[in-house]
Amino acid sequence: MWYPLIGGWFTELPHPGDGEEERCFVRIYTQLDTWKKFQVGKRVARNGAGMADYILKLFDRELIRFSAKDTGDIPEISITHIDQDSLSLIPLGMEVTDKGLARWLKHRKIPRNRAYIHSFLAKTGLSANSTMGIIDVSKGLSLNDSYWVVREGDSKTFDQCNLYDNKFSELLANIAFTGYGSSVRTSVVSSPEFTTNGMLPKCWRRQSGKIYLYKGGTVGASNTGNEPYSEYYAWQIAQILGVNAIEYNIAKWKSRLCSKCEIFTSKDVSFVPVGNIVKQGGMQAVIDYYGTLDSKYRDMLEDMFVFDAVIANTDRHFGNFGFLVDAATNTLKAPAPLFDHGNSLFNFASPIEIESKDVFINFADIQAPVCYSNFFSVAKSCMKSRHREGLRHLLNFKLKKHPRYNLSSKRLKYIEIAVQKRASLLLEGETHSESELSFW
């Protein structure tokens, strides 16, 4: 197993020249010969019939050569070569083993719980069970970063194929968002939809030279479909609190209400979710990791806990916050702006909960985070003076209505009251309230 650390990579290998079972940690550049011999033997043993040869690249730089056999959701992988001078450019959090690369490839495709996934893939002649089939068509290109995967012998360049600069299929965007549309020849497919995470209907659209994410809401019940409103109003609250968050608007596309936001990554700046780096230990492990970083990262994490407590964000998970990364050097650049606040501001309150203020407030009071136990104890334990100033501004705030699309005036009023109450609760007492999480 290889371990990414600041300043280099470590791997666990047999002690050189020692026939015993003893193992030790050594810097990778001291074990290149051992690693190459290990890989050659493995390649001879495992590179059997039915495997195709691929290259994982960053821009046009080769990182890893490997053979792959499409055996379903997780492909059979055999790494055949690792560029010794590019170890620091390996995707953050990816274990450079056959299984580690297979897992990375699995997550380089549209998730199984995505709305309309089967319709989307069927229209392109693909299957959710064929990871390498999807990779063959999409080249693993993403709007999160500048990694991609090509068949050995493919002469195309990153400039010719990347999704940031090149046109992508409007037809596939339509299918991804609505589930309807004509079949598409995979030989001409270029779309970010193959590598976009999340379960709600969504698609990327290029407008006036910029790229925007359109995301619909839940459907099927009287308390669904409010996510676009929550995104729009949560951003207003972030502005009052001084929190760095992505601006959302409300729009309609294909007759469906959706949120709309501009992309915050580029060819040069990638997004890496914290879950790619901190893989176990839960939120406490995340806090501990942030504690090893510059103060701007700790400030952002504190801002997130306070903001989530105010808006009752019940879907903050390890995939929707993290880091902006310099794509050229693969090093942390800044904390990523906060995004994905559709499951906040009591979006699942039903018509029954809207009948009276008291019923709505009771519903608001029982909301809980997904990765820790209590909004208020955690937020209070990391609050600073900058947060109190913003919270005081929320005590009498009013939501600004959208020019065209809005929740009912009654629901908006109740949201304002609930947010004001939550701000007041956070301002009460000292900041050392008991919390299940410990900070710096």
What positions do the PLM features span?
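Canonical protein kinase catalytic loop motif
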Residues: H317, G322
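Phosphate/dinucleotide-binding and metal-coordinating scaffold of catalytic cores
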Residues: W2, G8-W9, C24-Q31, W35-V306, ...
